[in-house]
Amino acid sequence: MALKDKVAFGMSLPHRSPDPLDMVAIRHVARRAEALGFRDLWVTENALDHVYSFDPVGILTYAAAITTRIRLGASVVVLAVHSPMNVAHQWATLDRISDGRAILGVGLGNEHHYRDYAVPKEGRVRRFREEVEVIKALWTQPKVTYHGRFYQLDGVTMSLKPVRTPHPPIWMGVGHPDALRRAAKLADGWMGSGGSSIAAFGQAVPALRAALQAEGRDPDKFPISKRIFMAVDENPEVARAQLHRWFTEVYRNPAGTDASGIHGTPEQVRARLEEVVAMGANHLLLNPVSRHAEQLDALAGIVGLT
């Protein structure tokens, strides 16, 4: 059975790189991924970054304008550095422009987000929950009254609503047990980060499924995904070298080459993807790190889309 018949596949836009960003490559990947049958396109948010990176809403709006069917997601937007009111409006706008194709991935963020943006860490989990609740309320209610610890809204109106009902899906990430329980309660999908190991993903999935069951939700109907940084080449040493450069320069973690990424010949890459599917994934985000047009077609063949 082809991999495409077991799980859905997303494709990363080439929006973050140690090399200057290439709009020709972004345009090609967006259109070609849609034509090949990938389900969604994804980006990350990294404004203060030591490598080149586009704003997620801006580049997804561009992708929306040059495609018609493929879904458009960010994994993840760090809510702590944004107003949830602005996030709700931006993503309602993107959902309108794309005719209901937006997927909002959200996260708590890391230490550097709170330091660089001068955001207090105190109460960050409570604030994150309130931000998700405020976004959902603004998307679904004609007038919003919300009294939380961090956000106070009294009869406010955001007239622009998303196309998608009840609202665009909200995905979460991170494999900490508390984060998995939050995802089971608040989210519409979960994606393991590209920097986390494949082994950690395998450990997180059973805990997430148990948390979903505890919330009375069907784990088989809940998107469980993993972003995988990838390099495929008939010469496995070439593939590994490309991925090693990525993890060294972007993540500053060369060990991620083997622990978190997948590299090798087409046969080796397919075998590793099968292993991740066997861990419980029902969606995989493939993230080539170079030669994007060539890698896109190669990966489409590996998973059975061509």
Where are these regions (language model features)?
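N-terminal small/glycine-rich loop or linker at the start of catalytic domains
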Residues: 1-18, 110-115, 147-167, 233-260
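Flexible, glycine-rich active-site loops centered on histidine and acidic residues
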Residues: 2-22, 81-146, 150, 193-194, ...
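Active-site mouth loops of central-metabolism enzymes
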Residues: 11-24, 77-85, 164-175, 230-231, ...
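Alpha-helix-loop-beta-strand connector modules within alpha/beta enzyme cores
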Residues: 50-74, 127-134, 138, 299-306
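N-terminal beta1-alpha1-beta2 module of alpha/beta enzyme domains
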Residues: 1-66, 168, 289
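Short, acidic/polar
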Residues: 20-33, 86-90, 172-185, 242-243, ...
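Conserved, mostly hydrophobic/aromatic
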Residues: 33, 37, 63, 94, ...
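Hydrophobic faces of well-ordered beta-strands that scaffold small-molecule active sites
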Residues: 7-13, 41-43, 72-75, 102-106, ...
